[in-house]
Amino acid sequence: MKIAFMGTQCNGKSTLIEEFLKRWPMYKQPKSTYRKLIKSGKITNNEDGTQESQKAILNAIIDDTQAATATGDKFLVFDRCVIDNIVYSLWLNEHGKVSDEFIIDSRLIAIQAVKTFDIIFYVPLREEIKITPKKSRAIDPVYRQEIDHIFRALVGTYEKQQGIFFPKEDCPAVIALEGPPDLRIEQIPLYIKPSGKFFDESDGSLLSNI
């Protein structure tokens, strides 16, 4: 089982993953080299990102995923995935900072890389969550909202099975954890069993069995 959490910054995603690991301790969260890359100051990110930096981050995310998968661990949870990179690249594209060709190339890479996962949980923006300043973190509330709008648009393409950013075949389930922050973790047992495995088509979700 490989699970990823995606969503805009400063929105309680890391806290949610911490809660997830407490409830499902069989899961491991691999170390992130792309975060080290950002913190090193060698590349720019967020509003100041470039094609070079976004490419480096995309490669690092894919390398992290492949390295973790190669360990043979059955239960892995990731903070962000290739879709996050695409979202931030799309924002940069809208502001003339990366080319259309770059987006096309990144999309083709991401649409294959995303097949690695079994479930991707999308964490929608909750405006009541305060932005906490931190190194290498964007703290503009407008930017945070714009990024979330792009996430929602991409999730919409998944729901419509358009095959633009998510593959039509071998695609992970993409699930939005709507509602206030304290209810996010309570929704996950609808999809993940106490054993750490997910409810598949053969046994339905917990919700369908009620």
Give, region by region, the residue ranges found by the protein language model.
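The conserved Walker
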Residues: 9
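Hydrophobic anchor at the beta1->P-loop junction of P-loop NTPases
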Residues: 5
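Short loop/turn segments at strand-loop or loop-helix junctions that form parts
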Residues: 32, 79-82, 121-127
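Conserved substrate/cofactor phosphate-moiety recognition/catalytic segment
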Residues: 18-63
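Glycine-rich phosphate-binding loop used to anchor ATP phosphates in small-molecule kinases
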Residues: 55-115
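C-terminal accessory "lid"/substrate-recognition subdomains
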Residues: 159-176, 182-210
